[in-house]
Curated annotation (Swiss-Prot):
Domain Rieske: 107-212
Associated pathway: Steroid hormone biosynthesis; dafachronic acid biosynthesis
Location of this chain's protein in the cell: Membrane
Sites where the protein binds [2Fe-2S] cluster: 148, 150, 169, 172
Protein name as annotated: Cholesterol 7-desaturase nvd 2
Membrane topology label: Multi-pass membrane protein
Length: 452
């Protein structure tokens, strides 16, 4: 409001002085009092600063795009109800079908490494669990179940890192080892009960991101999450974040759904699937995509699969195709949640690090971090990746509004999709949590907590 007020004063000062001179009510030497001139100059300075700030963000600042659940991926045809009501109805009416377990086993991104400093405690919520993520005094990342087994206070809400590597509950000061999760101190007790502990989650940090290992049966990680081989030769260009209402398997399964690429992703611009054909540009310029998905070839790395995409962007006039741009994407899926996407264009090389993490059943957090050749201007990189983001948001519309069935109707040309489903089954186990027919989350083999 203050900035808007100053801008109005600026316009008023300029127009009023000139108007009085033109009307002959004062001569060319006329000026408003000094105080008004000071306000005018301050307003001009603020406007210039705002313009320069906007220009800097567009030209030089990395992309930082965050979409909430309600921002993208829903249709709103019935305007007699609000958009929020429409989204709730879509979620409520979604048929669950015979779905796989809701949380696969593997590594999942939970934060950027820079988000949590040495000695800090952060509250995070993933896999339907409240967790305490903290960095100990030596800089090592730790994660524990957030609820103290004493009186179930949330240790991530006011808890502190103490004794180099312990999390202290803010309620009564009970201290738990970040390395083991065991209770190590009760400040007012003569003897510490040795059988008390909280669940400790395995952590790692790769490419500037913090990951947790999820497994329904606990235990140590089954594989090491690798760093991207090209990231150290590229520069950071930004990131996007989307919250999605779907089963987690829908998202990586997209890689093996080859037939959708040349249909859903054929138009070059726009994330609104219902309006992409209204654009003149989309009726002239098209993607022509060839792709293949392959299961793992290395028996020592069954958790990895690959995909290759060749994308010819062409201008079509009277059915004559004129090539405009050729793109290649080499995609490495690592477990159920991490993907390295290597981008080749005629002008630069790029990298997208995609991560999908379950927040709770049928709610996923999808992030993309972007990197490009060092000499590429950030504004060019942002434009390229924003176009890629519009393609992702078309998929989100499909994911948010579809359901999942174990045995869909497939034609023989979709054999890769069936192979992908068989490959992905390795990330579920007998005790993986599931949704029952009433929509309740069930943990097989895990006793229910008794009401107190």
């Amino acid at each position: 409001m203050l900035i808007e007020y100053l801008i109005r004063i600026t316009v008023m000062v300029i127009t009023s002085e000139r108007l009085l001179i033109l009307m002959g009510l004062c001569d060319e030497s006329f000026h408003f009092p000094v105080m008004i001139r000071v306000v005018f100059n301050a307003a001009v300075a603020i406007v210039i600063a705002l313009v320069m700030s906007k220009l800097y963000k567009v030209l030089f600042a990395p992309l930082d795009l965050r979409r909430k659940l309600e921002d993208v991926g829903y249709v709103h045809h019935d305007h007699s109800v609000s958009r929020e009501e429409n989204i709730r109805d879509t979620q409520r009416r979604k048929k669950l079908g015979n779905t796989p377990p809701v949380f696969p086993n593997g590594w999942f991104k939970v934060a950027d490494s820079t988000w949590i400093k040495k000695g800090q405690v952060k509250s995070i919520y993933f896999f339907g669990e409240q967790l305490a993520l903290f960095r100990n005094k030596r800089g090592l990342l730790r994660a524990l179940d957030a609820y103290c087994p004493h009186l179930l206070a949330n240790m991530a809400a006011g808890g502190k890192v103490v004794n180099s590597d312990c999390l202290e509950c803010p309620f009564h000061g009970w201290k738990f080892s970040g390395e083991t999760g065991k209770l190590v101190d009760v400040p007012y007790a003569q003897k510490v009960p040795t059988f008390v502990s909280v669940k400790k989650w395995s952590c790692c940090e790769v490419d500037g991101m913090a990951y947790l290992w999820y497994h329904c049966d606990g235990g140590e990680p089954k594989w090491v999450l690798p760093s991207s081989v090209t990231i150290n030769t590229l520069k950071y260009a930004g990131k996007t974040e989307h919250i999605i209402n779907s089963h987690i398997q829908d998202i990586p399964e997209n890689a093996a759904d080859i037939s959708h690429l040349d249909h859903l992703h054929k138009p070059v611009i726009g994330s609104d699937v219902e309006k992409t054909n209204e654009s003149l540009l989309n009726n002239l310029i098209f993607h022509s995509i060839q792709a293949s998905w392959k299961p793992p070839t290395d028996p020592n790395e069954p958790h990895r699969s690959t995909m290759s995409i060749k994308d010819n962007i062409h201008l079509s006039i009277f059915n004559i195709k004129i090539p405009l741009l050729y793109l290649e994407f080499e995609i490495d899926q690592i477990g159920p949640g991490a993907v390295h996407i290597h981008v080749r264009t005629p002008f630069f090389r790029g990298l997208m690090l995609q991560n999908v993490t379950p927040i709770e059943p049928f709610v996923q957090k999808l992030t993309h971090s972007f990197y490009v050749s060092p000499w590429v201007p950030v504004c060019i990189a942002k434009a390229f990746y924003l176009l890629e983001t519009t393609q992702i948001e078309r998929d989100i519309l499909m994911w948010n509004n579809k359901t999942y069935f174990r045995q869909p109707v497939l034609v023989k040309e979709e054999s890769a999709l069936a192979k992908h489903r068989r490959w992905y089954q390795q990330f579920y186990s007998e005790n993986s949590p599931r949704m029952n027919h009433r929509g309740d989350l069930v943990y097989p083999g895990k006793p229910k907590l008794a009401d107190w």
